[in-house]
Amino acid sequence: MSSNVTSPSGNKNKSSHANASPSSKGKAKAKVDHPMDEDEEEEEEEEQGGSDEEEDDDEDEDALEEIDPSVILPQGRRTRGVRVDYTSKEALAKAGFKGKEELEEDDTEDDHDVQMKD
């Protein structure tokens, strides 16, 4: 009562598994990429054009600008690890900000201009 589908002795299944993957599916070794020597790279660059070398020189000169010595902090003026109190009246005045009391006064002065609508 067995059929060809349920019978383990069927020859059809054996032949279908033998060629499950075609040879063009990446089973072969990868092609080796031969790196160029430095001499070959230089020759190719020269063949492409010599104007690239002039542009490279300009870029190098721009990166070598002089450093302004006035922006360098003298020793002992580092700010790393220093606690700064930004809430003091002196700090707020120096920054041009108003203190809490002045802000509260400004708020109360503007209140008389506002008219509430019911």
From Swiss-Prot:
Listed Acidic residues bias regions: 36-68, 102-112
Name assigned to this protein: Histone H2A.Z-specific chaperone CHZ1
Residue pairs linked by disulfide bridges in the UniProt entry: none
Biased composition (Polar residues): 1-17
GO CC list: nucleus
Similarity comment: Belongs to the CHZ1 family.
Complex formation: Forms a heterotrimer with H2A.Z-H2B, stabilizing the association of the histone dimer. Also, with a lower affinity, forms a heterotrimer with H2A-H2B.
Pfam families assigned to the protein according to its UniProt record, in alphabetical order: CHZ (PF09649)
Composition skew (Basic and acidic residues), residue ranges: 82-92
